[in-house]
A protein has these predicted regions:
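Short, solvent-exposed turn/loop segments enriched in Gly/Ser/Thr/Pro and often Arg
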Residues: 54-56, 91-100, 120
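Generic structural signal for well-ordered alpha-helices
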Residues: 36-40, 74-78, 104
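His/Asp/Glu-enriched short active-site or ligand-binding loop at hydrolase and phosphoryl-transfer sites
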Residues: 59, 112-125
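Beta-sheet entry/capping signal
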Residues: 47-51, 88-91, 104-107, 111-118, ...
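CE4/NodB-like, metal-dependent polysaccharide N-deacetylase domain
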Residues: 67-94, 208
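Glycine-rich loops and low-complexity Gly/Arg-rich segments
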Residues: 75-79, 116-119, 139-141, 169-173
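Hydrophobic, small-residue-rich alpha-helical packing segments that form membrane-like cores
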Residues: 83, 97-113, 128-131, 142
Length: 208
């Protein structure tokens, strides 16, 4: 209604309305407000693999003076995963992809078979891997290590090489939570009334 006389905005407003309406239907009606159950369903069908992460995203190498803290990060994550998915996770995305020798033993003790680490953790391994970052390598414990793919990461994060800086995309930092008059947007903000992103973005990327 607000943008009906502004066709360049109204088209996007209609798109957002349809998108949010469908998202609400999928969440509230189709999956009964239980997204984890939906992920479990597709994992049980063999359509995807859900892995875990550190319980509180603790940076494991900086905890190496307290192995019990490291173990807790892993074991609590495994227990929480098992509670929701009915089995232990096979893999883990290490917090910040940070690895040091010995972490693989803790993962093995928890029943985890593979982990994700940084690209250079694979590329500069000893001995150097034959296939670089394009295949997993195995630790002495038998736990596999996969390197984070840098090209995929650049597509998501880089303002120069990826879509965050491509003029064909909407600007993440231009949001109606900040662009619209405060009195209009206030009912859609949190209780404290502070402006924040609400997820509706009308402007394309035009520069840095």
């Amino acid at each position: 209604e607000r943008t009906k006389h502004q066709p360049e905005f109204n088209r996007l407003a209609q798109m957002y309305y349809k998108h949010f309406t469908n998202a609400r239907y999928v969440y509230a009606e189709k999956y009964r407000r239980n997204i984890i159950h939906a992920f479990k369903k597709f994992q049980d069908m063999g359509k995807l693999e859900v892995i875990t992460c550190g319980a509180t995203h603790g940076y494991l190498p900086l905890m190496n003076n307290n192995v019990n803290a490291m173990r807790a990060q892993i074991n609590v994550a495994v227990q929480h995963y098992e509670k929701h998915f009915g089995r232990k996770p096979r893999g883990i995305w290490l917090p910040e992809c940070a690895y040091e020798p010995g972490i693989d033993q803790l993962l093995k003790d928890a029943g985890i078979r593979f982990f994700i680490t940084e690209t250079h953790g694979i590329l500069f391994a000893s001995p150097r891997p034959k296939y670089g970052n394009y295949a997993p390598i195995y630790c002495p414990t038998g736990v596999a290590a996969f390197g984070r793919d840098m090209e995929s990461s650049r597509q998501v994060w880089s303002s120069k090489e990826g879509y965050p800086g491509d003029f064909s995309y909407r600007d993440f930092y231009r949001d109606v939570g900040f662009d619209l008059d405060y009195d209009y947007i206030r009912p859609y903000l949190h209780g404290d009334g502070k402006r924040t992103n609400v997820g509706i973005k009308y402007y394309r990327i035009t520069g840095k």
